Amino acid sequence: MSTANPETPNSTISREASTQSSSAATSQGYILPEGKIMPNTVFVGGIDVRMDETEIRSFFARYGSVKEVKIITDRTGVSKGYGFVSFFNDVDVQKIVESQINFHGKKLKLGPAIRKQNLCAYHVQPRPLVFNHPPPPQFQNVWTNPNTETYMQPTTTMNPITQYVQAYPTYPNSPVQVITGYQLPVYNYQMPPQWPVGEQRSYVVPPAYSAVNYHCNEVDPGAEVVPNECSVHEATPPSGNGPQKKSVDRSIQTVVSCLFNPENRLRNSVVTQDDYFKDKRVHHFRRSRAMLKSV
């Protein structure tokens, strides 16, 4: 007496699924990719370029009510040679796959439609890089003078579009601190002070003047030289008849003294512009005093 083991519906479904998957893995000698098997859908390969969806629909209508025919094409619209045929009702996909179908004298490559499993692709959304603006760098001259001068550089505005620039860490001991996409070399220039420590620096600007040179000609000592005096006659007031005052230009006197004293020619040969204007101011002062006395 033999007892039959009753089969449950769950065991039947699992056995059919395992049989379908195992047979699909070796369909017509081709190793199929891993993925989810689409129900009531058949993969059709080896489609000729002359075939269209209408002909394929009419051909596979013998196996059931065709829901959709999809031929895969490239960007230019040219067929890649394979497609998918889906049915409305439940059909025996394994029976269709095992059948030998020749269409337009060309054997079709049939198989179950498998949707590839999406790999675990970690989508990393780029985050904007936040720039913490550091204080402006300070450039200090490395001198021994305690009164060091500090030059401030204006802060550079970072473009918000450049979000993927890696900022290198700064070094606190470097005299220049700049945060950019690359590290700048640091150079320390040491110069000795040009003035004593603690002494106040004063800048002397030389006056811009041109020297006026009065050259005297060589005069024979034995020759008689008559001094020429440049007399300036002042206008006398209409009410008085006082004597007219006579003033002599000091520059003319300098030339005359140079002529009479040959030993002082080199010393008095050059008269600068400052001495000339100084003598002229004294001349004007004496001239004004003479006018006051005459009045």
Curated annotation (Swiss-Prot):
Name the organs or tissues of expression.
Answer: Testis specific.
Compositionally skewed regions (Polar residues) per UniProt: 1-10
Question: What subcellular compartments does it reside in?
Answer: Cytoplasm; Nucleus
Q: In the record, which positions carry Phosphotyrosine? A: 276
Q: Name one GO cellular component term.
A: nucleus
Q: Which InterPro entries match?
A: DAZ_dom (IPR043628), DAZ_RRM_vert (IPR037551), Nucleotide-bd_a/b_plait_sf (IPR012677), RBD_domain_sf (IPR035979), RRM_dom (IPR000504)
Which effect does the record note for changing residue 54 to A? Probable risk factor for spermatogenic failure; this substitution may lead to affect the DAZL transcript stability and prevent its translation
Q: Which Pfam family would be a valid example here? A: RRM_1
State the residue spans of region: Homodimerization.
Answer: 80-132
In what ranges is there compositional bias, type Low complexity? 11-25
Q: What UniProt keywords apply to this chain's record, in alphabetical order?
A: Cytoplasm, Developmental protein, Differentiation, Nucleus, Phosphoprotein, RNA-binding, Spermatogenesis, Translation regulation
A GO molecular function annotation here is:
identical protein binding
User: Quick one: where's region Disordered?
Assistant: 1-25
Question: Which BP terms from GO are recorded?
Answer: 3'-UTR-mediated mRNA stabilization; female meiosis II; germ cell development; oocyte maturation; positive regulation of meiotic nuclear division; positive regulation of translational initiation; spermatogenesis
What sequence ranges are listed for the domain RRM?
40-115
* Keyword Nucleus recorded: yes
Q: Per the record, what about its domains?
A: The DAZ domain mediates the interaction with DAZAP1 and DAZAP2.
- What's the family? Belongs to the RRM DAZ family.
Q: How does it assemble?
A: Homodimer and heterodimer. Multiple DAZL RRMs can bind to a single RNA containing multiple GUU triplets. Forms a heterodimer with DAZ. Interacts with BOLL, DAZAP1 and DAZAP2. Interacts with PUM2.
Please give the PANTHER family that the UniProt record associates with this protein: BOULE-RELATED, DELETED IN AZOOSPERMIA-LIKE
Q: What does this protein do?
A: RNA-binding protein, which is essential for gametogenesis in both males and females. Plays a central role during spermatogenesis. Acts by binding to the 3'-UTR of mRNA, specifically recognizing GUU triplets, and thereby regulating the translation of key transcripts.
User: What name goes with this protein?
Assistant: Deleted in azoospermia-like
